[in-house]
């Protein structure tokens, strides 16, 4: 339902891992990238987030993504280690809670292998956002072996932001092909990331 407010509780929440600004960026941008929907997020000082659906389709029933993987909510292909099945259905509240939990899992992985994005570094909110957004899309293991991660750990923020761009391909019929959707997403992540390089 549009305009319903959902509270995301801080239970060692996202803001504790990546900071308030990065958590807000993730909770606003991931639904836009994954589902095309618009949400409004208000962050409390304790890290609790109030998420309000404004517009756009919500995928409460599972669907097949561009490469045929069952997906639900805001890009979830699994939850608590269980793959999403095409028959799965969720409520809006479940989707919001699941998104926050999955972002926490991905953020922890990113922060563990990327000490160059530690909260003690100033002006890293946008780079942290880009790193977690990419990891949410391609997996933590891929992030941790990426050139972007190596650049961020070396405090080469611009180079790290630029290294996001090659992650624009999907596998179709056994071949890697550029996805216009992923190319656009990587460009948007890079643009946000570069705000820390200025």
Regions found by a protein language model. Name each.
Residues 2-32, 96, 100-122:
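Export/targeting segments at the very N-terminus of extracytoplasmic proteins
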Residues 35-48, 60:
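Short, charged/polar N-terminal "headpieces" of proteins
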Residues 49-84:
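Substrate-binding/active-site groove segments that recognize
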């Amino acid at each position: 339902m549009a305009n319903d407010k959902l509270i995301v509780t801080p239970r060692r929440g996202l803001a504790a891992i990546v900071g308030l600004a990065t958590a807000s960026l993730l909770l606003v941008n991931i639904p836009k990238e994954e589902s095309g929907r618009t949400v409004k997020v208000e962050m409390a000082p304790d890290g609790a987030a109030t998420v309000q659906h404004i517009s756009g389709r919500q995928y409460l029933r599972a669907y097949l993504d561009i490469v045929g993987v069952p997906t639900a909510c805001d890009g979830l292909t699994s939850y608590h280690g269980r793959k999403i099945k095409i028959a799965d259905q969720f409520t809006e509240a479940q989707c919001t809670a699941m998104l926050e939990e999955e972002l926490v899992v991905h953020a922890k992985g990113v922060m563990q292998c990327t000490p160059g994005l530690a909260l003690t570094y100033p002006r890293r909110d946008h780079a942290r956002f880009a790193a977690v957004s990419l990891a949410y899309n391609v997996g933590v293991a891929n992030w941790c072996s990426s050139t972007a991660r190596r650049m961020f750990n070396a405090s080469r923020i611009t180079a790290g932001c630029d290294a996001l761009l090659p992650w624009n391909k999907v596998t179709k019929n056994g071949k890697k092909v550029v996805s216009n959707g992923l190319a656009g997403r990587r460009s948007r992540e890079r643009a946000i990331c570069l705000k820390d390089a200025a």
